[in-house]
């Protein structure tokens, strides 16, 4: 492996409406074929619908939903001797956010509703109530880590 210096991450510009970097990242992850304006419209519509329904601030709703979906530990495969072990490791904060966003978007895409903004709004609402596919995914990852706790000493 080459011994090069670590590359600095490019700063992400905050979204134009609410000036949030996390929301901007979410917009970029949701974007398909470079159509950012459509992605922004979907998210803003979903958050506006939730604001009307829950009477809370847009960003508060979004941050709470992300918090409920963020994983704390995950498992990684580690080969020791002739066998492969699933070793539980703690997740970095940047990866926590990325995984949570990805899981919410995947769960929203799998839903059967009319528009993506409705599906996204319902998935975020379910995440706030600790139910829904994204939260189930987090619990599944945590269960795997708990089941393989015996292999934690193989961490590297």
From Swiss-Prot:
One of its GO terms (biological process) is translation. SUPFAM superfamilies: Ribosomal protein S7 (SSF47973). Keywords: Ribonucleoprotein, Ribosomal protein, RNA-binding, rRNA-binding, tRNA-binding. The keyword Nucleus does not apply. It comes from the Bacteria. GO terms for cellular component: small ribosomal subunit. GO terms for molecular function: rRNA binding; structural constituent of ribosome; tRNA binding. The keyword GTP-binding does not apply. InterPro entries: Ribosomal_uS7, Ribosomal_uS7_bac/org-type, Ribosomal_uS7_CS, Ribosomal_uS7_dom, Ribosomal_uS7_dom_sf. Part of the 30S ribosomal subunit. Contacts proteins S9 and S11. Belongs to the universal ribosomal protein uS7 family. One of the primary rRNA binding proteins, it binds directly to 16S rRNA where it nucleates assembly of the head domain of the 30S subunit. Is located at the subunit interface close to the decoding center, probably blocks exit of the E-site tRNA. This is Small ribosomal subunit protein uS7.
